[in-house]
Amino acid sequence: MPTDGSYFHLHLVSDSTGETLITVSRAVSAQYANVSPVEHVYPLVRSQKQLDRVLAEIEEAPGIVLFTLLEQDLVERLEKKCQDINIPSLSIIGPVMQLFQAYLGSSTTGRVGAQHTLNAEYFKRIDALNYSMMHDDGQHAEGLEEADVVLVGVSRTSKTPTSIYLANRGIRTANVPLVPGIPIPHQLESLVKPLVVSLHATPERLIQVRQNRLLSIGAAIGNEDYIDRQTVTDEVSYARRLSAKYGWALLEVTRRSIEETAAAVMKLLADRQRQRPVE
């Protein structure tokens, strides 16, 4: 057993990529700052011959063994070896599968690597995050047609945080500021694929949020127009006129949290997708 400031061997045995094991084990290991794991990752272990090598390495460097194996023969052999050399082993998905089986009253299909359909969702989120960061605040307008959602609105209507929240759900989201006197990107006038949502808040709410923002960055002096009531009211009116002109969906965000705004956008997107004819 390792002592503080030492290390221990951590064997991760998977019949697929091993990403599930790595994610779980690192989340737990992070709670033990004084002990460092030496990871031994064994992906695609699907035969007795492949397991031979794994068992030899485990015996050579004993430690904790975590596994995601669906082939019962491999599981039994691995567990027996760990018992023989007196080291702990645990199936990461086994207890969860047992819980599902007890509740659902049916057995699994035993499909190797099935959990890695989750990986597709993971990469979808990463792609969406990359897209959203590249298309924040009106940047790279030439790529707006590639978005799932385009958020527009005046300053401090939560466009960026809502974009990031949606991206974390795998929704490619761009956002474009609406500023009186500055033409909108011409691409915004003729979008076909994306849902364009115009975020609106009352002038009173915008002034409050903007004042707090200026105070937080020490820029209250010299930015009086930014929080001038008439100026802000004109901005809100301008945004509403544009929304009406181009038929953008209107979403009132005055009393909404980021999560609530994102949920409303996702509902608009789902409704739109249901209404579109299947091509």
Swiss-Prot record:
Q: Which cysteines are joined by disulfide bonds?
A: none
| Entry annotated with the keyword Secreted | no
Which annotated residues bind ADP?
A: 153-160
Top-level taxon in the UniProt lineage: Bacteria
First-level EC class: transferase
GO molecular-function term, one example from the UniProt record:
ADP binding
Spell out the protein name for this chain.
Answer: Putative pyruvate, phosphate dikinase regulatory protein
Is the Membrane keyword given for this protein? Answer: no
**Family matches, as InterPro entries:** Kinase-pyrophosphorylase (IPR005177), PPDK_reg (IPR026565)
Chain's role: Bifunctional serine/threonine kinase and phosphorylase involved in the regulation of the pyruvate, phosphate dikinase (PPDK) by catalyzing its phosphorylation/dephosphorylation.
**Keywords, comma-separated and alphabetical:** Kinase, Nucleotide-binding, Serine/threonine-protein kinase, Transferase
Question: Hey, which family's this protein in?
Answer: Belongs to the pyruvate, phosphate/water dikinase regulatory protein family. PDRP subfamily.
Catalytic activity annotated for this protein? N(tele)-phospho-L-histidyl/L-threonyl-[pyruvate, phosphate dikinase] + ADP = N(tele)-phospho-L-histidyl/O-phospho-L-threonyl-[pyruvate, phosphate dikinase] + AMP + H(+); N(tele)-phospho-L-histidyl/O-phospho-L-threonyl-[pyruvate, phosphate dikinase] + phosphate + H(+) = N(tele)-phospho-L-histidyl/L-threonyl-[pyruvate, phosphate dikinase] + diphosphate
- List where this protein forms a coiled coil: none
Enzyme Commission number(s): 2.7.11.32, 2.7.4.27
